[in-house]
Amino acid sequence: TPVCALTLASNRPGVCGRMARMQIEAHNDFAADPFATHAMLTDPAFLARVCVESGDVSHRVDAVADHSAVERQRHTPAAVRNFLGDTLTLLQDIRWRPAAADGARTGTLALTVKGMPAKADVAIDLRPGGRGTLVDFVGQFTIKVPFVGGKLEGQAAPALLEGFGVQQRVGDEWLAAG
């Protein structure tokens, strides 16, 4: 079974919940070499399929070999709908550095929620290993909302886990289809 693991560690300050912060650590393991895995992760059709499989209301994808930008509109979780409205717009920006001889490369993922003081800053490490290629995501997700930051953080955790899991599942299907 493919590995998709996510670790979240919360760091909430005690004063009115002004800032909620989650440490993100997620891993994907794909059955392809790093060159093929990177090509998949930057293919606009793959990125669009991840959006569809994630249940996005709508999405817009722009991707080339070293940069992808995805705008995703999603239904807001019921527990925070009163604070945020019916939908959220997520802006995902991934930038890749050049590959090493073995296809290994690093990159960054910046995720923001349009109109909210929430963001994820994540380092990406793509390298040979596992079933072919391991992709590690390590960073922080921060929400700066007085009084409700902790509640919003609690709603974000399952969505982050789901996102990395969907990427693993869609990636496995994509690679198996050849």
What residue spans do the PLM features occupy?
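Glycine-rich portal/gate segments that line the openings of hydrophobic small-molecule binding cavities
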Residues: R60-L109
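Beta-strand/loop substructures that line and gate deep hydrophobic ligand-binding cavities in soluble
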Residues: A104-P158
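Solvent-exposed residues in well-ordered beta-strands and their adjoining turns
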Residues: D29-D33, R74-T76, R95-R97, T112, ...
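A conserved amphipathic terminal alpha-helix motif
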Residues: R95-P98, G149-G178
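Short, Lys/Arg-enriched N-terminal segments with co-localized hydrophobic residues
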Residues: T1-R21
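Short, surface-exposed coil-to-beta transition loops
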Residues: Q23-E25, T87-D93, A118-A123
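Hydrophobic ligand-binding cavity/cleft-lining segments
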Residues: V15-Q73, L84
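Short amphipathic beta-strand and strand-loop transition segments with alternating hydrophobic
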Residues: G55-V64, R95-W96, D121-P128
